[in-house]
Regions:
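Compact, charge-rich alpha-helical regulatory domains located at protein termini
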Residues: 1-48, 53, 59-65, 69-96
Length: 96
């Protein structure tokens, strides 16, 4: 099942897990992903509680030494470590 926070997706949306270190943008929505160890509803709840809500500003501050995982992301005014696989559930777009 796919869940969107945004009813009007654009072609500018892409997955946070694909972004390089230093990238800045905003959260445009959440989508379900395959292969989670927990139900999608639980993952969605966790991401929302961490601050990955529509319109939140973010920046990738750091990526890990092994396969660039996990990534450190500043979401508004907090810093969060997220696995790249989980970050693929977060749709983002560049700041215009």
């Amino acid at each position: 099942m796919s869940t969107r926070l945004n009813d009007s997706p654009t072609t500018k949306d892409f997955r946070l897990g694909q972004c390089p270190k230093g990238w800045r943008g905003i959260v445009s929505g959440l989508v379900s992903i395959e292969g989670l160890s927990i139900p999608w509803s639980e993952m969605e709840r966790r991401l929302l509680e961490m601050g990955f809500v529509e319109g939140a500003a973010l920046e990738i501050l750091h990526d890990g030494p092994i396969q660039h995982d996990p990534i450190a992301v500043r979401v508004d005014d907090i810093t969060i470590a997220v696995r790249r696989a989980d970050a693929n559930a977060i749709l983002v777009r560049p700041v215009e």
